[in-house]
A protein has these predicted regions:
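Intrinsically disordered, low-complexity regions
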Residues: 1, 5, 19, 70-73, ...
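Transmembrane alpha-helices and adjacent helix-loop boundaries
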Residues: 1-65
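Intrinsically disordered, low-complexity segments enriched in small/polar residues
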Residues: 7, 39, 57-59, 79, ...
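Intrinsically disordered, low-complexity segments enriched in proline/serine/threonine
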Residues: 8, 41, 67-70, 77, ...
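ABC-family P-loop ATPase nucleotide-binding domain
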Residues: 43-97, 326-335
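Glycine-rich phosphate-binding loops of nucleotide-dependent enzymes
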Residues: 85-92, 96-335
C-alpha cells in the first residue's frame, strides 16, 4: 500500500469531500506512473540507480586487473594449461547418433570443426542442429559415436565438465537472471575457470568489455535490457569461462540490421582473438559473409559440408530448404 504524508493525506481528504472518489484517481495515476517508469518495481529501479551511482569508473575500479594479470585475463582463448593444435580439427564428431523413441534427431553425423575457423551449422527447422549442440556440450548423451575435443574424449561428460575443457555455449532463448545486474549474470559463467570471486569478476568484466557492455551497462539490471544487449550479455557469459570453442545457437535471432552488423563484428573479433566458433543461424545472407565453412543438416543427417560458395549452390541443400515439389516446379518453369 502506498503511504502518503499526513499533509497530502489531509489535502486529499478535503478534496475528496468536494470531488467524491478523487483518492482512487490519484492512487490509480500513481500506479500507472510506476508501471510505466519502473515495471520491475520501485525497489529494483532504485537498486539499479544506486548501482550506477557507485559503479567504478572503467580502468580505475576494483574490477580492473592489475598489469601483471592482464595477460592471463584478456586472451580468452587461452586453453588453461592445455595445448590446442594450430591446424586441423579442434572438435571431431564420428558417427554421432541421438534418438528420441523412433526419431533419429542426430543420425550418424561425422564432421570436423577446424581450429581457428568460424563454422556454420545450418538446415531447415527440425533438422537437429540444436540437438547436435546439446549432445556436444553434454546436455544430451549420444546413443552412439564419439566426440573428441583437442584430442580429449568428451563423450559421456556432463555440461560443467565439457565447459571446463574449453567449450562455451549460448542458447536460442536467453535465460537471464532479470533481477541481477549484467555483471552478476556474467560472473556466473566465470566461476568455472576462476579460483576466487575477485578473479571471476575480472574475467566477467573483461568479457563484457569485449562485447561492448563494460561501462555503466555492466551495472544495469538485466531485466531491462534490449534484445541486442541480452544477446551480448549471454555471449559475454560464455566468454567469461575462457573457451577455446564457442557454440552459438541463433545469436543473431531477433536483431535488426544495425544490431546484427554490430554482433557480426563482435563475433569476427572474438574469432580473430583465437576463439573457434560454431554457429547455428537461419539468417543466410549474414552467415555467408561470416563463416569459413558450412555443415548442413536435414532430418538429423549431414547432407553437405564445404565452403559457403559451394554449399549454397548444392541441389540437395536447396531441396532441403525449399522442398522437392518446389524444385520440380522450378525445373518445369525453366523447361
Amino acid at each position: 500500500m502506498v503511504k502518503l504524508s499526513p499533509t497530502l493525506g489531509r489535502k486529499l481528504a478535503e478534496l475528496g469531500s468536494i470531488i467524491p472518489g478523487i483518492q482512487g484517481v490519484v492512487y490509480g495515476i500513481a500506479i500507472i506512473v510506476i508501471i510505466l517508469l519502473a515495471p520491475e518495481g520501485i525497489y529494483w529501479r532504485v537498486r539499479e540507480w544506486l548501482a550506477r551511482r557507485t559503479a567504478p569508473i572503467k580502468g580505475t575500479g576494483a574490477w580492473a586487473p592489475a598489469a601483471p594479470n592482464v595477460a592471463s585475463v584478456v586472451p580468452i582463448a587461452e586453453p588453461r594449461g592445455q595445448t590446442t593444435p594450430a591446424e586441423g580439427p579442434l572438435l571431431r564428431l564420428q558417427a554421432v547418433r541421438r534418438t528420441f523413441g523412433g526419431l533419429r534427431a542426430v543420425d550418424d553425423v561425422t564432421l570436423d570443426i577446424n581450429n581457428g575457423t568460424i563454422h556454420g551449422i545450418i538446415g531447415p527447422n527440425g533438422a537437429g542442429k540444436t540437438t547436435l549442440f546439446n549432445v556436444i556440450n553434454g546436455f544430451l548423451a549420444a546413443d552412439s559415436g564419439n566426440i573428441t575435443f583437442a584430442g580429449t574424449t568428451l563423450t559421456g561428460l556432463k555440461p560443467h565438465d565439457v565447459c571446463r575443457h574449453g567449450i562455451g555455449r549460448t542458447f536460442q532463448v536467453v535465460r537471464a537472471f532479470p533481477r541481477m545486474t549484467v555483471l552478476e549474470n556474467v560472473v556466473i559463467g566465470a566461476f568455472v575457470g576462476s579460483t576466487s570471486n575477485a578473479e571471476a569478476e575480472r574475467l566477467a568484466m573483461t568479457a563484457l568489455d569485449r562485447v561492448g557492455l563494460a561501462d555503466e551497462q555492466a551495472y544495469a539490471i538485466a531485466g531491462g535490457l534490449t534484445t541486442k544487449q541480452l544477446r551480448l550479455m549471454e555471449l559475454a557469459r560464455a566468454l567469461a569461462s575462457r573457451p577455446r570453442l564457442l557454440l552459438l545457437d541463433e545469436t543473431l535471432a531477433g536483431l535488426g540490421h544495425d544490431a546484427l552488423e554490430d554482433v557480426l563484428r563482435i563475433i569476427r573479433q572474438i574469432n580473430r582473438d583465437g576463439v573457434t566458433v560454431a554457429i547455428i543461424e537461419h539468417t543466410m545472407h549474414a552467415m555467408v559473409k561470416l563463416v569459413d565453412r558450412f555443415s548442413v543438416l536435414d532430418h538429423g543427417k549431414l547432407i553437405a559440408d564445404g565452403a559457403p560458395a559451394d554449399v549454397v549452390k548444392d541441389r540437395t541443400v536447396i531441396e532441403a530448404y525449399l522442398g522437392r515439389k518446389w524444385m520440380e516446379r522450378a525445373q518445369d518453369s525453366v523447361a
